[in-house]
Amino acid sequence: MSINNLFDVSGRKALVTGAGRGIGKVLAIALAEAGCDVAILEIDKKTAESTATEIRQKGRKSIAIQVDITKKEQVDKAFAETAKALGGLDICINNAGISIQKPAEELPEVDWDKVIDINLKGVFLCSQAAARIMIPQKSGSIINIASMSGIAVNVPQKQAVYNTSKAGVAMLTKSLAVEWAPYGIRVNSVSPGYMKTEMTMASMTHLFPTWESLTPMGRLGVPEELRGAVVYLGSDASSYMTGHDLVIDGGYTAR
């Protein structure tokens, strides 16, 4: 196989959660541009359909499915619908997640449960549903979007529950990689650093100078800088890579 063909994902069937906006939307469109058909799973049906429409305009098949990833029945139904509509599932990107920033001593139990349910339980339920499709195929790539927050404690924001959830995603990734390797399923994670997204631009711009000063490259990343990593992990170029956390943080965790 030539080096160019190693990175070829054209014709593969992909699914991205939380792809109505932000990082998830960028990754879903990137896969479509690389030749994948893509299912968009989102809690917000309107934004999901918007992303799916953009993908269809690029000449690829895309469906939008409204789903609460913390509900097993909804997840299983959405994945079954995806496999039927696209003709299988080769790449699953578990991107959906939330962050709540409050001092740990003041964090309500309901907020802890909400973040853990979406960021960790949701990733597990979606990975489980993906594996049930991929095991009979004897192939597949699951890519979990973790965070550098699962490796290093962020400052100055206080977000113990978010950090904990993302550390859990990284370990879940390793555990599933070992369990499912015999079935030809690879499971890896991507841990972004500070990113300029719709969410951070809307409410966290006052923190940008601090974040930039703590990042060796001196700037925040943009979601588009994650596209290459996802195509790599979804392609045959990463055929011997599983259980790995790919950190893309401008050098933050290398300090």
Regions found by a protein language model. Name each.
Residues 88, 181, 186, 241-243:
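Short, small/polar-rich loop/turn modules that mediate ligand/substrate recognition or access, typified
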